[in-house]
C-alpha cells in the first residue's frame, strides 16, 4: 500500500444499495472495497460529506451488512464512501470475503 490509504483495497463486483436520509434508495456496483470503505459506480451525484447508509451482501453474514458511511469523493461515474464504525462481526466477515478477492493495485 502506498499514499494515504490505511486499508488494502480488493477488487469486487457486488451490488450496493445507498440510502440518503429522506430520499429514495439507489443502487450502484462496487468496484473495490476495504475495511475503510467502498468505491462504487453510479450515475447518481452525491455531494462530498453526505452521510448515507450502505447495504451490501457479504457471504459470511446471514443478512446484508448495513453500514453508515460518508461521501469522501465523487466523480461523474462513481462515488467513494468511507465507512463509519464497523461491528466486529462485519470486520470478521469482510476479512473472510477478502481472502477470495484480488487486491487492487496501488495508485502510483
Report residues per predicted region.
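Structured alpha-helical
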Residues: 1-108
